[in-house]
């Protein structure tokens, strides 16, 4: 990456027999909002702590602005960290909390005042400088913590699940505020969360970590629409997966054997195989289709068609979640807008989707995806 401000190369972190981060290579662009996303224990927070200087890599290197930082103390690195716990000084006013870093750097009193007031206005807390942390709401405390971190003008701001303690409505509001602030200041944000919606809402790119490995990195659209692994497909939102084996590839068509049926795919599969970048006969694969991409039909139509029976509907506000049962007993999840005409529970229907909405994933190496076309139940 041409303008990488953070460059992580071949980094491993091992605690005893626990290999927490495995051969991580990651470049973060200047001014980018990058999110490290994954479930608990995947290595995302450890990665953040290594950048901050609270942990050291077992092997590998980390550079910020092209300079190695492994031998630098946390306070010597041009990065600041915001934690979920806020870590505000309860005996200090909001002004003094935000000004603390400037005071330690012996910045003049007049400049401190000017920069603190400017930063409080930026995080929409103008007029709060004389209050104490105990007089603020959770969202206000988090904005103070962010202001305190940003006032030192770091090149990189590290955020470790900073919104995790907030209620849902406030969390959504803070997501938009953080994104606005990041774009206004043009500071690189590296954000850690296990919340998929949070990552999709704020990020320029998302790095998905799983069991210490970075499974995929890409834009929110790429991650959601074209997952590279089965883990990514099932971790980001909901999806329907069909596991099977490619039985044959002939004349541009790949036939995938699944339980109680076959899925036939045509299109660019053959070209991929010829180039040794696609799929092969006897390969174990996964087909992934998002619930919102599926549709009801009273009759089979061109494309992929699945006979099923409507089992249940779940109302969740503007969306209705639909559950249908396949002949083999497996369930398929669909999403429809509230108010749409829907078949009755117990009614037998066909489920279909557009060819470009299905994704074929290599299941063994979990490192490649391919769109499927003209998919249907054989």
Tell where the protein language model's regions lie, with residue ranges:
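Non-catalytic connector elements of ABC transporters
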Residues: 239, 249-378
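ABC ATPase nucleotide-binding domain
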Residues: 7, 27, 63, 350-352
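Conserved coupling/switch loops of ABC nucleotide-binding domains, chiefly the family-specific signature
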Residues: 58-61, 111, 211, 243
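The feature captures the beta-strand-to-loop junction immediately N-terminal to the Walker
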Residues: 37-39
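Conserved ABC transporter NBD signature motif
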Residues: 60-68
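ABC ATPase nucleotide-binding domains
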Residues: 33, 72-234
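Helix-to-loop junction immediately C-terminal to a conserved catalytic motif
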Residues: 52
């Amino acid at each position: 990456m041409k303008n990488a401000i953070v460059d992580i190369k071949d980094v491993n972190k091992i605690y005893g027999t626990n290999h927490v981060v495995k051969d991580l290579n990651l470049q973060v662009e200047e001014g980018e909002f990058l999110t490290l996303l994954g479930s608990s224990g995947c290595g995302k927070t450890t990665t953040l702590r290594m950048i901050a200087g609270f942990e050291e890599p077992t092997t590998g290197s980390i550079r910020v602005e092209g300079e190695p930082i492994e031998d630098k103390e946390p306070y010597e690195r041009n990065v600041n960290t915001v934690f979920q716990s806020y870590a505000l000084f309860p005996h200090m006013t909001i002004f003094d909390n935000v000004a603390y870093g400037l005071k330690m750097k012996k910045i003049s009193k007049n400049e401190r005042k000017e920069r603190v007031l400017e930063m409080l206005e930026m995080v929409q807390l103008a007029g709060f400088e004389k209050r104490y942390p105990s007089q603020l709401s959770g969202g206000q405390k988090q904005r103070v913590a962010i202001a305190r971190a940003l006032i030192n003008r770091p090149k990189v701001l590290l955020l470790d699940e900073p919104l995790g303690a907030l209620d849902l409505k406030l969390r959504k509001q803070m997501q938009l505020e953080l994104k606005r602030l990041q774009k206004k200041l043009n500071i690189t944000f590296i954000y850690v969360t296990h919340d998929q919606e949070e990552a999709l809402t704020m990020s320029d790119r998302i790095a998905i970590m799983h069991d210490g490995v970075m499974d995929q990195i890409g834009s929110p659209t790429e991650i959601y629409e074209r997952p590279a692994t089965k883990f990514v497909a099932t971790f980001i939102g909901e999806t329907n997966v069909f596991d099977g084996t490619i039985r044959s590839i002939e004349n541009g068509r790949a036939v995938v054997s699944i339980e109680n049926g076959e899925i036939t795919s045509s299109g660019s599969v053959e070209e991929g195989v010829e180039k040794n970048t696609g799929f092969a006969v006897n390969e174990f694969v996964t087909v992934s289709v998002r619930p919102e991409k599926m549709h009801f039909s009273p009759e089979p139509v061109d494309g992929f068609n699945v006979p099923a029976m409507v089992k249940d509907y779940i109302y969740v506000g503007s969306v209705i979640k639909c559950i249908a049962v396949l002949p083999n007993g497996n369930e398929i999840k669909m999403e429809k807008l509230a108010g749409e005409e829907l078949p009755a529970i117990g009614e037998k229907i066909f489920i279909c989707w557009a060819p470009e909405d299905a994704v074929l994933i290599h299941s063994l190496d979990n490192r490649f995806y391919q769109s499927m076309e003209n998919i249907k139940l054989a």
